[in-house]
Amino acid sequence: FTGILTAAGHSKSTFIATTTGLVLNLILDPVLIFVFNLRVIGAALATILAQIIVTLVFLYNAKNLDLFRNIRILSKPELNHISEILKIGFPSSVQSMLFTCISMYIARLISSFGAISVAVQKVGSQIESISWMAADGFSASINAFTSQNYGAKNYDRVKQGYKTGMLVVGLWGLLTTAVLIFLPGPIFSCFIHETNILPYGIDYLIILGYSQLFMCIEIATQGAFNGLGKTLPPSIVSIIFTSARIPMAILLSHYLGVNGVWWAISISSIIKGTILVIWFILYSKRRLIS
C-alpha cells in the first residue's frame, strides 16, 4: 500500500496510516510491558495491534480512491509486467526478508539482557523513527523525481534533484542527531518515567543518535537508486552490513553489555550510509551523462 499510494501521489494517506501505527505503538509498548507485566510478549502484542490498525487505515483509505476501484484481482496478469516487477523488486524483497531475520536475532540477543533492555529498544526505536520516517518520505519523493527525469533523459535534473534531496535530508539527519545526543533524557522520560530504566534509554538514544545522519542519507540514496531502476546496489550494501550487525553485536555486547548491541546497529548504519552515497556519486558520474 505504501509504495502504490506514494507513487500515485497520495503520500498523505501513507503518512496518516504510519503515524497512527507509530503513536499507537508508543502508547501500547510501556503499558503492555510494564503495567500488565507482559514483558517480551507485551512488546510483540503492541507491534501486532499497531500493524492491524495501520492495515485497517490503509484499507479504509483505499476504498475511497479511484486508484483501486477498477482492480480485478482474478484477471490474468501480463507476463512482461511480471518479469519487470520481479527484476526490480526481487533484490529489495530479499533485502527486506533478510533484514527481518537479522532483526529477529538481534531482538533475541537483546532479550537476553532482560525486560528493561527489550522495553528500551522498543520505545527507543519508536522515538528514533522520527528520523527514518521523514527520510522515507523524502526517499519516495526522490524516487519519483529521479524516475521521471531519468525516463525523459534529463540527467542533469536527476543529479540536481539528488543534491537538493540530500541537502534537505542531511539537515534533518543533523537535527535529529543533535536532538537525540543532547536531549535524550527529556525525550525518553516522556514515555517511560521509571528512574531505573531511564539511564538505559538515554544510552540508547545517544548511541543511535550518532548514526541518524548516515541512516537518513542512506534511505534517500536508496530512493535515488530505485528511481533509476537499480535496486541491486542498495540491496547489496544493506544485506552485507546489516548482516554484519550479528557478529558485531555478539562481540561488542561481550565487553559493553547491551550497549554493545546499540553500537553494532549504529556503526553498521554509518557504514551503509557512507558506502551507498559514494556508490551513487560514482555511478552518476559514469552513467548519467547528458
Regions found by a protein language model. Give the residues of each.
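Hydrophobic positions within alpha-helical transmembrane segments of bacterial inner-membrane proteins
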Residues: 22, 26, 30, 43, ...
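Membrane-water interface regions at transmembrane-helix termini and the short interhelical loops
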Residues: 1-9, 29-41
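Short runs within selected transmembrane alpha-helices of multi-pass transporters and secretion channels
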Residues: 1-6, 14-25, 43-56, 136-139, ...
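Helix-terminus/linker motif at the lipid-water interface of multi-pass membrane proteins
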Residues: 31-38, 97-130, 148-149, 186-195, ...
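Alpha-helical transmembrane segments of polytopic integral membrane proteins
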Residues: 29, 59-62, 103, 107, ...
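Small-residue-rich hydrophobic transmembrane alpha-helices
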Residues: 1-14, 107, 120-184, 215-237
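Hydrophobic faces of transmembrane alpha-helices in multi-pass small-molecule transporters and flippases
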Residues: 12-19, 57-60, 74-105, 109, ...
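Short alpha-helical transmembrane segments in multi-pass integral membrane proteins
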Residues: 24, 35-90, 146-211, 252-290
